[in-house]
Amino acid sequence: MIELKDVQGFRPDYEIPIKRAGIKSFKRRVKLNYNNESFDSYVDVSISVSLNPDRKGLDMSRTIESVRSSYNLNDVAYDIYNDLFSRINYSSSGYVNVSFDFYYNNKIYPVSLIAEGDKNDVKRYVEVSAEGMTVCPCAMETIRSIMLYDYNVSYGDIGISHNQRNKASLKIQYIKDAHLERLIDILESSFSYPVRNMLKRYDEGKMIIEAHKRPKFVEDVVREIAYKAAFMEPEMNLYMDVRSESFESIHPHNAYAEIEDYTANIRSYLKNR
């Protein structure tokens, strides 16, 4: 019988520890169970572990073997993480990211479920992205002043401004339930107005009017998302990262804002309001 050498177990030429070694963008079809229903989805999986300085490489095939064909959606990254560490005994920490499209309210949202950390202290995160419309409040007030001063025209509550398509994401630690629908609702309600795949003329006009009633900077978007997310679990202190990017209509560059903090800190900033 042929004897195959375990080259991954050799000592490397340069004994330097590696933070992450593994696979990226492994795609497969899995069945996900969620809220008493199940659906098939093509997932994109990235898996990595730390390597000690005396080990040349990771047993890559074991990362693939750790991905099954069916999961509870809330536990998919966590279960892959635990399955992987049942197959290897030479690493102390790991990272698993499972990304897929989630269908909700006739729209598709990118979702990532993440498990990472030391094998005895694994933390779970969910990240959801959505797109919406923002209306610049500074331009609105500037135009309001110009129209009154130069043209003697006074606007009511709704002024003129330039608009942006905004992409926002919310990454937050969770314990058992990823609360995908709640997170999506938080994102969608924090724009000037959510975007739609199809609009008839009247609906388009109403959408623009409603958006101009709620003008927002990119900074306003991340603050509102952070505020709403911080009170989802008011007794817990969870890591959170909120990002928002506005694709400018009058500039060749984009506007960006980010909040990275813990939910207890967010609540403490607002306790005297």
Swiss-Prot record:
Pathway note: Cofactor biosynthesis; 5,6,7,8-tetrahydromethanopterin biosynthesis
Catalytic activity: GTP + H2O = 7,8-dihydroneopterin 2',3'-cyclic phosphate + formate + diphosphate + H(+)
UniProt xrefs under Pfam families: GCHY-1
Keywords recorded for this protein, A-Z: Hydrolase, Iron, Metal-binding
May be catalytically important (site feature) positions: C136
Keyword Hydrolase: yes
Gene3D superfamilies: Urate Oxidase
Enzyme class: hydrolase
Cofactor: Fe(2+)
One GO MF term attached to the UniProt entry: GTP cyclohydrolase I activity
Biological process terms in GO annotation: tetrahydromethanopterin biosynthetic process
Cofactor annotation comment: Binds 1 Fe(2+) ion per subunit.
Enzyme Commission number: 3.5.4.39
UniProt similarity note: Belongs to the GTP cyclohydrolase IV family.
Function description: Converts GTP to 7,8-dihydro-D-neopterin 2',3'-cyclic phosphate, the first intermediate in the biosynthesis of coenzyme methanopterin.
Assembly: Homodimer.
Name listed for the protein in its UniProt record: GTP cyclohydrolase MptA
Annotated organism of origin: Picrophilus torridus (strain ATCC 700027 / DSM 9790 / JCM 10055 / NBRC 100828 / KAW 2/3)
Gene that encodes it: mptA
